[in-house]
Amino acid sequence: VTELAKYAKEKGIGLIPAINSPGHMDAMLVAMEKLGIANPQANFDKVSKTTMDLENQEAVGFTKALIGKYMDYFADKSKIFNYGTDEYANDATNAQGWYYLKWYGLYNKFADYSNSLAAMAKERGLQPMAFNDGFYYEDKDDAEFDKDVLISYWSKGWWGYNLASPQYLASKGYKFLNTNGDWYYI
């Protein structure tokens, strides 16, 4: 990665490193269990294979420490750090993870988690970036999110997956990087 970062700098190419959480954490969840962290997965209709339980403080602490190490590494190699936040527990909820977070009163925990990662990026001089999914789900102000986060807008949602519209997020002052998943393979 150091060699790639050096090459990119020589060519004037910006890198955007990404560590996706609290979803898409398959390998990290397996590693947590092997390291003795009990039940790091979200559990709704079934246990998620991809998403961390935001109420498991040991899992959250481990994840923040790991992401912090990557942020430290990239602080002098990149201007932006994408910390993910998309598709929360879709594998455990029939693609309704955000709905479940709201139903169980956990949506503010997600916002707090997202905001803490944004703060970590800013402390290191990095522009925080996150995918749009969980920000103001259903165009509602059920929680507050850091306004400095650059939104990587990848999906407008699909049936029953009611993501905030670009217009709604723009009205709140967010800036975007268009990463629309309909136009390329992610």
Regions from the PLM with identified roles:
Residues 1-130:
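Substrate-binding cleft of carbohydrate-active enzyme catalytic domains
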Residues 88-91, 96-186:
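Catalytic-core regions of glycoside hydrolase
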